[in-house]
Amino acid sequence: VSQKRKTVTLYKDNFRYTLKHISDIIPEANQAIKTLERFGEVIEKALINLTIMEFEDLVTLFEVTTILQKFTLMMRVAEDIEKYIVELGVEGRLIQTQFDEITGDLKKEVDALIRDYYNDDKGQVDIQIIFGKLREYEEEEIEIEEMAFILGYKKRYETLDQKVVPKGYRLLSRIKRLAAKDIETLVSNFDGLTAIVDAREDEL
């Protein structure tokens, strides 16, 4: 603690970090929240368009990877905001509330999106591992071919034109009456969302 400079510096091994004053952090946090909100709006619009394409059976890997690309950039902003919230302490409650409102449902949607399009016949996917892989990239913008590879597809540009069919997790999760086990049963018994939508009542 430097009383002369009115600063607090944290040390751990070779790591050194000087805490900022609250009056400096709040404007930065508010600006980051606005950026996060813009990302959220763009992704939500893309998900609406994706839903329309899913019902028309027109989805290609390009649409899916583009959404994931945007979400990865959004995650980086989210990580910065989480640091601001920690530094602000009780002063960061409003920022925390705004953060939760923006990211809460959207993260669930993207979780389901990954489950829908992960290229594994067994339907086994560890969401945390996928998110971990996405965080490994430090580039300003991850190439969508890289996104395709993370989802289990070949890392080639022409792969992006490949038509893909969702398993149904994302849209089925919106039906409040369906428990998680019911969704798993439907996904296991049918070959994709189109088959579920086209199924007769006695088949469901």
Give, region by region, the residue ranges found by the protein language model:
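A generic structural signal for ordered alpha-helices
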Residues: 7, 14, 52, 59, ...
